């Protein structure tokens, strides 16, 4: 874990080294100053030597200035190093997520990834800053002060050496108990973020069903869980200060009493006693500082582990050692394919799929919810890998192709239509960043999106809000289809992508496809048989298996499921189940 985190320091190694170096210099200056102060008292004030007081005082001022400068530099370098580490961690995690397959992403919830990219990275950033500065300052202060104290008077120094040992053990017990609650806190942050994300993204549904009180209650519960665990940890940590104060005051009283006796006996000077008291405070405060460092590091350890889970996750889908960069045509073949989302699944989602589609064919796919329609087409663009068998595109196993090449040639319009913040033109150019305005207009004409775009005041420069909330569901679908067409793919997959448009527009889109992109192999998943009945062939899916495959007329004669649904839809009745992932 430590190696993974530190590997992201990269260009900030120099400032990461300079931070503790400057801090060590500051501590050395601070530890020498009490010795000079003792000299002023014993050799200057007591002896009435004004010259000694002036010279030593100037040296003290110089050392204080050096200490201050080194402290400022240490803080500056530490801020650069910790902020740089946080930046690199966020970039590394985000870039790693971009390489994940769908199966990798299934292991992390959206809210969990957001927490890791924000709260967890901030915790590690703060801990790194503290480690660079305070983890240098506290041990160095304790060590130097202890050595100097024993050099002055070993018997008095042993008093707070014993106090340090006792206090250290007590603080360790406190920190160990508090750590358990901090680990739980960060797990509960995921629940809080999930509640916020779901509520904001689904606010229209919440209001439509008057579920504001329920959602508010759910959020309050998540917030209360975090509060309760933080409070439990803080109750334990609240013992830190009383124990610290008791130890400090007890040590000062004991050292003062013993020191006074030593002064009377002539074995200790007043300046040396002041030094000992100063070093006593420095040692005990350093111990308190270490206890706070322990808390911060303990909290950040939980965050660091969660960050490393993302960075150490290996993508399930990778390019072959010698990838193929050319796909000759849009033919697609499934050879006895089995597929499951998890390796430990009791039964596969797809079972023994054997299917051959020639280039330029239009294939309709229908089936009820859970029949694995989407799972089937996801294998063509290698969003997932098969569990058994082979999927071939252009006569080659999809695992032989360069992933970017494959996905550029197999364009998918997913069930969930997603648009991004930006203009319509910017969204369209996700399909081809170099597409001209004329090419974008042609794609929109094929998708019947030009009809509403031209009515907008700003046309193709109309700004799309986050998630496409300022356009209708049907308009989002048509823009997503146009975006996919700009890739000029050899294979086009429409996953129930016209469900929100009216039947007339649906028919216009299908006619445009037939006339304008006849050389593209098309897979059209639909709930309405009218959307696929003109396809070259229609695939009927049922519980992860092929129930029927043929033309509309053939299926009406041979497939009971197809017959039943066709008759029902023709008579204005039922439909395949809608809304689920097929």
Predicted feature locations:
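Membrane-integrated ABC transporters
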Residues: 1-33, 37, 45-59, 73-78, ...
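Transmembrane helices of ABC transporter permease
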Residues: 11, 15-28, 60-63, 69, ...
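An intracellular "coupling" helix at the cytosolic face of ABC transporter transmembrane type-1 domains
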Residues: 11-14, 99-103, 119-132, 136, ...
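Hydrophobic alpha-helical transmembrane bundles that constitute the permease/transmembrane domains
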Residues: 20, 24-32, 65-72, 124-127, ...
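Juxtamembrane helix-loop junctions of ABC transporter transmembrane domains
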Residues: 21-22, 29-42, 63-110, 114, ...
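Short intracellular "coupling" helices and adjacent cytoplasmic loop segments at the cytosolic face
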Residues: 47-48, 83, 91-115, 119-121, ...
